[in-house]
């Protein structure tokens, strides 16, 4: 299957108390997805169901998680979760469609 390729970089900037991070390294890895994550983000942003920062976190997190789950759907953890995730995705698509039409 052809997939979009991404480089994901994560940098810790502050702890849960607002103090500057003590981590000096960034986490960087390559990830692949059957969807164009930027297009997914655009759809979520256009729906205005979340503020811009939340939309970015949600779109990226959702697509990274879902691709790993699909690639490892034979594992019991993911196999048991797949029907629930399918329901969630249907609800999300309906919500985005409804919000975009408003």
Model regions and ranges:
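N-terminal intrinsically disordered, cationic/polar leader segments
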Residues: 1-52, 76, 80-102
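Acidic, low-complexity intrinsically disordered segments
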Residues: 52-84
């Amino acid at each position: 299957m052809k997939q979009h390729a991404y480089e994901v970089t994560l940098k810790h900037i502050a702890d849960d108390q607002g103090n500057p991070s003590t981590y000096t390294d960034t986490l960087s890895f390559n990830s692949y997805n059957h969807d164009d994550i930027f297009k997914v983000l655009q759809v979520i942003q256009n729906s205005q169901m979340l503020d811009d920062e939340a939309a970015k976190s949600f779109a990226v997190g959702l697509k990274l998680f879902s691709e790993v789950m699909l690639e490892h759907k034979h594992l019991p953890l993911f196999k048991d979760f797949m029907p629930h995730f399918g329901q969630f995705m249907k609800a999300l698509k309906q919500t985005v469609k409804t919000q975009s039409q408003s």
